Amino acid sequence: MGNVCKDILLSNGGSFWVATTSGISHYDATDKKWKSFTQANGGLIGLNARRLSLDAKGQLWAAFYDGGVSVYNPTMEMWTNHGVGEGKLPVGTVTDVWVDAEGVAWVTSFSGGLAKYANNKWETIKQEQGLPTNSLLGITPGADGSLWLSSVAGAIQYKGDKFTSLTKSVNKLPDDNVRNILFAPDGSMYICTNTGLQVRNLTTNEYTNYGASNGFISSYVNHVAFDAKGNRWISCWTEGFYLMTKEGVFYKIGTTEGFTPTDVYMARFNEKGELYVCTNDGIFILKNPDSLVQKLTSTEPTLPSHSLIVAPNPASSYTELQGANASAEVRLTTLDGVLLRKMQCDALGALRIGLEGITPGTYFLVVGSKAYRLLVSE
C-alpha cells in the first residue's frame, strides 16, 4: 500500500483504517496484521481514497477522488460501490463522505456538488438548487444540526435547505479556497484555507486570521487537531506540521523532533491521547504529545507572540490600542465589515482612537489579521 495517507479512523484498542492514494488498509491491533484493499484485490471503486466515515452499523464509507464511494460491510467482509450514472453520483471526483445519526450519507464532490444517500436512493444538490458552487472539498457537521461545506467559494453552511456563505470579501477569510472546517471543543470554528487559517467565534463573529500577513503559514492548511489541554496541531501541505499552544504561540515540528514529511494531511488522537499523523511519507505516531509540547515550549517559538490591548472597552469618547506591530494599519468597521475609519499605529505599535461621531453600538477594530470587538457606549 502507498505511503501517502490522507485520512485515518482510530478504534479503541489500537486498530485503525487508513485512506491512501493506493487504496485502503486496515490494521488489526489484536492480530497485529495489516489487510489492504485495492481495485484488483478488494473491489474498490477507485484507488485515490480521500476520506473515511463509519456509520452506526459499523460500516466503513470511503470517498474516492477517482471513482465515487465504496462501503465496507464488516459482517459480510465485502465492499459495495456507488459510482456515476443516472440515479447515482453526479461525478466520480468525490472529496468527502459523512454519515449522520439517521444513516443518511452526505457526499461532497469537485464539480458535482452535494449528494445524499437515503433509503437506497441518491439525491443531488447543485447550484441550480442554490448551492453557491459545485466544487466542494469537504463536509463537517455543526452542533446545531447544520452541515458546513468546504469549497472553492468559501465556507458554506447548509441548514434548513438554505445556504449561507463565509467568504474572503465579506467575512475576511484568508482565502476563498477552503480546504477543511473543524470545530474546537469550545465551539470555535477553524477554517483551513489555501493561504492560512481563520479562527472564528460564530456567536460574536470575532475572528483571527493566521497566514502570510502575520508570518505564520503562507500556504495550504489541511487540518487542525485539538488536544485535551487546549493545544492545536496544524497539518499543512508543503509546510509540514505545527504546534499552536493554548496561548497562541507557534512552533514548527521538524527534523529535530524526528519529523521529516513536508505534506501533512491530517492528525487524530486515540483514546490514550496518542497522536496519529497522516503524511506523504506514511503515518507518524506521537506516543507522548505532552513531552513534545514541553520540549518545544522550552525553545524559541517559530513566531513572536504579541499581546494586544484595547482599553477602555467599552469606550465612549476614545479608546487606546497597545501592543500592535509598528505602524500597523487599524480599521474601525461595523459588524458587517463596512469601513468607518482607517488609521495607523505609531512606531511603538500604539494608537489613540477618537470615537467622536460614532453611534453607540458594537464594532470591530481590525488590526492586521485580527478583529477585536469594541463596544461604544453613550
Residue ranges and their predicted role:
Residues L303-A311, A315-E378:
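C-terminal outer-membrane/trafficking sorting elements
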